[in-house]
Amino acid sequence: NGIELYRDKPVSSWDIREDGRIIGVTEALAAQDIYELGEKVDPFILAEGTRMGHIHLSVKDSREASQFYQKVLGLEDKFSIPSASWIAAGQYHHHLAVNEWAGKGLAPREQGLSGLAYYVLEVESKEELLNIVKQAQELEAPIKWLNSSELDLVDPDGIVTRIRLARWNEENTLFILET
């Protein structure tokens, strides 16, 4: 969850060195004052039934996060570099990517902060759900059952994955009720 705010100065005032490097200036921004000047809007909520092909998560340690999701969710590594990993089920390029591009000192996510509160992963059977629970318990990952077919799993970075049995409508097609 990052945004860069800047205002370009005229090129004539840039600090351009003989070797072509441009030396930038970073100054503290009075973010709260600027926020107070703006129009307040309701938080953005995805439309009901929105389905994602894949998501990217900011984590403190991409290797640790990748191994966690591989062990607990049964995903496979598709491609990794020292600061990121792309993992998936089956032959898909990636369902989940984790990266540490926000910094190695990234604090665990806390409930109530801006950004992704949780994402939903649907599984096809109770056995699959219980296997995820077993794998999570082996890693001592926090689990909170919401009902008999839905739980929240918290990863080492404080990111919540809501896992539930797939729901079907009268046309027998998969859909997500969450917004």
Give short role names for the model-derived ranges.
Residues 84-87:
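Beta-rich nucleic-acid/ligand-interaction surfaces
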Residues 1-79, 90-147, 154-179:
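Glyoxalase I/VOC metalloenzyme domain signal
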